[in-house]
C-alpha cells in the first residue's frame, strides 16, 4: 500500500505527464500511448539515474509520438542528472534531444559520437544500404528522403 507521500509524488508525476485521469484506470483499459505515459511515470517514481527507452514510440499514433518526444525533451531539460538510452529505428524520434549516440548494423557499430558526427548521409547509407538525403528543419527535427 503506497504511503501518502508516494501517492502525492505519483499524482504530481502523472499531472506533469498530463495523465492524472489514468491513475485509477486499469492498464488493460488504456491505449498504447496511455500505457507509455504510465510506464514513464512508474520509472520516474524511483528517481532513476538511467532510463532505457526501448522503441517507446513503436505503437503510438502521431499525437502520442509527439507527446512522448516532448516529454523526453522536458525530462532532458529538467533532469540533467538523468541519462536516457533511447533505442529506436526512427531517427527522427531522437532529435533534438540526444547529445551523443551510435548507429548499429548487425550488432556492429557503424558510427558513434555527437549528433552531427553520427547523423550523416554516409553513415545512414552504410547502416541501411539506402541512398538517404537528410533535411533538418529549423526546430532541429530531421527528415529523411530516400532517393
Predicted regions and their residues:
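Conserved ABC ATPase signature
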Residues: 26-30, 34
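Helical segment within the ABC ATPase nucleotide-binding domain
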Residues: 66-80
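ABC ATPase nucleotide-binding domains
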Residues: 126-147
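Catalytic Walker B motif of ABC-type/P-loop ATPase nucleotide-binding domains
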Residues: 51-55
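H-loop/switch region of ABC-family ATPase nucleotide-binding domains
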Residues: 88-89
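Conserved ABC ATPase "signature" region
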Residues: 4-22, 47
Amino acid at each position: 500500500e503506497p504511503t501518502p507521500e508516494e501517492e502525492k509524488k505519483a499524482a504530481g508525476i502523472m499531472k506533469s505527464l498530463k495523465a492524472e485521469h489514468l491513475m485509477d484506470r486499469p492498464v488493460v483499459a488504456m491505449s498504447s500511448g496511455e500505457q507509455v505515459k504510465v510506464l514513464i511515470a512508474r520509472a520516474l517514481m524511483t528517481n532513476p539515474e538511467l532510463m532505457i527507452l526501448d522503441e517507446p514510440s513503436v505503437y503510438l499514433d502521431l499525437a502520442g509520438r509527439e507527446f512522448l518526444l516532448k516529454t523526453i525533451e522536458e525530462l532532458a531539460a529538467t533532469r540533467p542528472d538523468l541519462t536516457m538510452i533511447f533505442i529506436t529505428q526512427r531517427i527522427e524520434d531522437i532529435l533534438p534531444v540526444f547529445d551523443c549516440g551510435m548507429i548499429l548494423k548487425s550488432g556492429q557499430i557503424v558510427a558513434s559520437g555527437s549528433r552531427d558526427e553520427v547523423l550523416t548521409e554516409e553513415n545512414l547509407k552504410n547502416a541501411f544500404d539506402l541512398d538517404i538525403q537528410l533535411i533538418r528543419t529549423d526546430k532541429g527535427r530531421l527528415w529523411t528522403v530516400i532517393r
